[in-house]
C-alpha cells in the first residue's frame, strides 16, 4: 500500500452497544476513497498492522458493529480511508490515507450494583455506576408484597443525573408511597430505547426520618444525650457517631416514665470540643436483611 495525502482523514466516533461496539465514520471531504480499514487495539500507541486490523468496509458503510469485542473492556479504535482502484507506474495498487485520531471506546460498567436510599417523604435516590453510552435510564418500581400496587415507570435523561464522584451517579425519584416495601429495576437505554445494561435490583422500605429529635451535651461530663419519638411498625434503629475518625454506635433503649413514647441513648464525647456528626435511621427487617428509612444527621460540639 502507498500513502496518498489527498485521500484525507476520517473522523471516528465509538459507542458501546448491547453486544460489542459501534463505530460511526465521518468520511473525508476529498471523497476519493473506496472504503476504510478498521483497527482495534488495547494499547493507545498502537501502529496499524495486519495484527490489529479487524475489518475493511466499503465507502457506503459508515456504521460498523464490532460484535466480537468485549464491551466490558476498553479498546482504542481508528480508521483510515483507502483507494483500492489506485495505480502506480501501470500497476494496480491500494492507496491509504491518514489514520484517524484514536478513539477510546468507553466500556459498559462491570459493577451493576445499585444502592437505594430513602431520601425524604416519598423520595428515593438510586446510586450506581454510569453507563457512558446511555442516552437515558429507565426505572421500574414495583411492590413485591402488594399485589394491588400499580407498577411505576420513570425515564431519566442521562444528562440530568446527579454526579456523586468517580463514575458514580444518582437519580432521584419522588412521589412514591410511604410505608411500602419497593423494588427498583434500573436499565440503561440508547436513544431508541434499546437496552444497553440491566443493573441489579435494589430495594427500599419507605420509612421517614425519626421525629422530635433532641441532642444535648452535658458540659461537665461531656456525655451526649439523645432522644426521639418512637416510630410505629419499625424493627429497630441505628445511631452512629464519628469520634476521632472512627464510627461508633450509640446504644438506644426505650425511655421510662414520661419518656415511654421515646427512644433514648447516650455516649461520652472527648473532652476536647469539636464538631461531632451523628446519624439516626429506623430499619425494618425482611428475612435476614435490614432496610433503612430516611437518615437524619446532626452535628454537636
Regions found by a protein language model. Name each.
Residues 1, 66-89, 173-196, 269-290:
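Beta-strand-rich modules
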Residues 18-22, 61-63, 74, 121-125, ...:
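A generic structural signal for beta-strand entry/edge sites
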Residues 1-31, 71, 87-133, 178, ...:
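Pro/Thr/Ser/Gly-rich low-complexity, intrinsically disordered linker/stalk tracts
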Residues 1-4, 49, 58, 83, ...:
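Acidic surface patches and DE-rich sequence motifs
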Residues 38, 128, 139, 173, ...:
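Gram-positive cell-envelope targeting signals
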Residues 29, 42-46, 83-87, 132, ...:
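Solvent-exposed strand-loop boundary residues in beta-sheet-rich modules
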Residues 34-37, 135-137, 182, 235-237, ...:
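Short beta-strand/loop motifs in extracellular/secreted proteins, especially
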Residues 37-70, 138-178, 238-271:
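Recognizes extended acidic, P/S/T-rich segments that occur
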Amino acid at each position: 500500500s502507498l500513502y496518498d495525502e489527498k485521500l484525507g482523514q476520517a473522523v471516528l466516533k465509538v459507542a458501546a452497544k448491547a453486544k460489542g461496539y459501534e463505530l460511526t465514520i465521518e468520511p473525508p471531504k476529498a471523497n476519493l476513497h473506496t472504503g476504510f480499514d478498521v483497527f482495534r487495539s488495547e494499547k493507545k500507541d498502537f501502529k496499524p498492522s495486519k495484527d490489529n486490523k479487524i475489518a475493511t468496509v466499503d465507502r457506503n458503510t459508515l456504521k460498523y458493529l464490532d460484535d466480537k469485542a468485549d464491551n466490558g473492556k476498553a479498546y482504542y479504535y481508528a480508521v483510515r480511508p483507502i483507494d483500492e482502484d489506485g495505480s502506480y507506474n501501470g500497476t494496480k495498487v491500494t492507496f491509504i490515507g491518514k489514520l484517524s485520531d484514536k478513539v477510546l471506546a468507553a466500556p459498559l460498567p462491570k459493577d451493576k450494583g445499585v444502592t437505594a436510599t430513602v431520601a425524604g417523604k416519598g423520595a428515593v435516590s438510586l446510586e450506581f455506576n454510569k453507563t457512558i453510552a446511555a442516552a437515558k435510564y429507565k426505572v421500574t418500581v414495583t411492590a413485591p408484597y402488594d399485589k394491588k400496587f400499580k407498577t411505576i415507570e420513570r425515564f431519566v435523561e442521562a444528562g440530568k443525573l446527579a454526579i456523586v464522584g468517580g463514575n458514580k451517579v444518582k437519580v432521584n425519584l419522588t412521589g412514591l408511597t410511604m410505608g411500602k416495601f419497593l423494588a427498583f429495576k434500573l436499565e440503561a437505554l440508547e436513544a431508541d430505547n434499546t437496552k444497553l445494561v440491566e443493573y441489579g435490583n435494589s430495594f427500599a422500605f419507605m420509612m421517614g426520618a425519626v421525629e422530635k429529635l433532641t441532642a444535648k451535651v452535658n458540659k461537665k461530663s461531656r456525655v451526649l444525650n439523645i432522644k426521639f419519638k418512637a416510630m410505629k411498625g419499625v424493627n429497630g434503629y441505628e445511631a452512629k457517631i464519628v469520634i476521632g475518625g472512627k464510627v461508633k454506635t450509640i446504644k438506644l433503649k426505650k425511655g421510662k416514665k414520661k419518656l415511654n413514647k421515646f427512644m433514648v441513648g447516650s455516649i461520652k464525647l472527648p473532652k476536647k470540643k469539636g464538631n461531632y456528626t451523628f446519624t439516626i435511621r429506623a430499619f425494618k427487617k425482611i428475612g435476614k436483611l435490614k432496610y433503612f428509612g430516611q437518615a437524619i444527621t446532626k452535628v454537636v460540639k
